[in-house]
Design a protein with these regions (language model features):
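N- and C-terminal low-complexity/disordered segments
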Residues: 1-98, 102, 108-132
Length: 132
């Protein structure tokens, strides 16, 4: 193997080790990290917005509806895929957005991400959690 190929393999290995693994189960948070960092980004990554949400010991943070967002997560037992939906009509316009929740909820680590066809579909699927 050439020196260039060896160096490239070493860089890829280092990057793979640095990228967090997305676990299907939640695990306890052992460090001082608290709350969730919620983001919504455009499908082409031309824009992103984010906000911190803390649910323990009480809803707080700059999220505009921290109480509603925490209540929605509590009802879903911390699983954004199980949020109670807020159905309302949406256009079929394809303008994808990706929602992400990273951090901790009630002491459990979370790294969740999902792409929706547009902002309206995101809103119907996630209710107050990503309304910021």
């Amino acid at each position: 193997m050439s020196l260039r190929a060896t160096a490239a393999a070493a860089v890829l290995l280092a990057l793979a080790a640095a990228v967090p693994v997305h676990a299907d189960t939640q695990e306890p948070v052992l460090d001082g990290e608290t709350g969730l960092f919620l983001t919504v980004s455009g499908g082409d990554e031309s824009w992103i917005r984010g906000v911190r949400l803390r649910c323990s010991p009480r809803p707080s943070g700059p999220h505009p509806d921290a109480e509603g967002a925490c209540a929605a997560l509590d009802a879903a037992h911390g699983n954004p895929d199980r949020l109670v939906t807020d159905p309302h009509p949406c256009t079929k316009r394809f303008d994808p957005v990706t929602a992400r929740a990273v951090g901790e909820w009630r002491g459990l680590r979370m790294d969740w991400r999902k792409t929706y066809p547009n902002v309206c579909v995101l809103d119907t699927a996630t209710g107050p959690l990503f309304r910021f």
